[in-house]
Amino acid sequence: MSDNLALHGTTILCLKKNEDIIIAADGQVSHGNTILKSSARKLRTIANNKIIAGFAGSTADGLALFEKLEAKIEKYSYNLLRSAVELAKDWRSDKYLRRLEAMMIVADRSHILILTGNGDVVEPENNVAAIGSGGLFALSAARALMSCENNLTAEEIALKSMNIAADLCVFSNRNIIMEKVV
């Protein structure tokens, strides 16, 4: 099995439309070309849905990063941007953390951020971010739907985009879980 497939076998999408911020994730867990589970939960909420995070990559690594992020968020008084930067610095410089194979999207009312093991904290343009093997499909669909004149809600755009990604990416499925930042 390729390490690249192990790292990126999922789809996580986050978007903001008007005042609504949605993070969506598919439910498929794959190992190589085998589906191990179709209803995994890849999203976690922090501070009563004020901060939501989703991960792509190794499940154990993603959960370890959630714990580290949650500790940083508490340490820095729920300042997501500072917490993300501090986590990224630790992730890049710590001998143990550097080996973690995952990416994260985190969002609150003010920021949508992509965090990588390279120490990157990226705030994407156009209020849309996606990671994982189906990420580019979901990102493209969401950006297209958001650029059209329509009455679709953030939830509807996220669901349509995730379903398009699931149709195109063999490592993603249509068992979509969505969370809304409050």
Curated annotation (Swiss-Prot):
Question: Which SUPFAM superfamilies does UniProt cross-reference here?
Answer: N-terminal nucleophile aminohydrolases (Ntn hydrolases) (SSF56235)
The active site is formed by: 10
A GO CC annotation recorded here is: HslUV protease complex
* Entry EC no(s): 3.4.25.2
Q: Name one GO molecular function term.
A: threonine-type endopeptidase activity
InterPro entries named among the record's database cross-references:
ATP-dep_Prtase_HsIV_su (IPR022281), Ntn_hydrolases_N (IPR029055), Proteasome_sua/b (IPR001353), Proteasome_suB-type (IPR023333)
What keywords is this UniProt entry annotated with? Allosteric enzyme, Cytoplasm, Hydrolase, Metal-binding, Protease, Sodium, Threonine protease
Cystine bridges: which residues?
none
Please cite one Gene Ontology biological process associated with this protein. Answer: proteolysis involved in protein catabolic process
Its main subcellular localisation, reduced to a broad class, is cytoplasm
Activity regulation: the record says: Allosterically activated by HslU binding.
Output the HAMAP family linked to this UniProt entry.
HslV (MF_00248)
Task performed by this protein: Protease subunit of a proteasome-like degradation complex believed to be a general protein degrading machinery.
The text of the family note is:
Belongs to the peptidase T1B family. HslV subfamily.
Q: What is this protein called?
A: ATP-dependent protease subunit HslV
Annotated gene: hslV
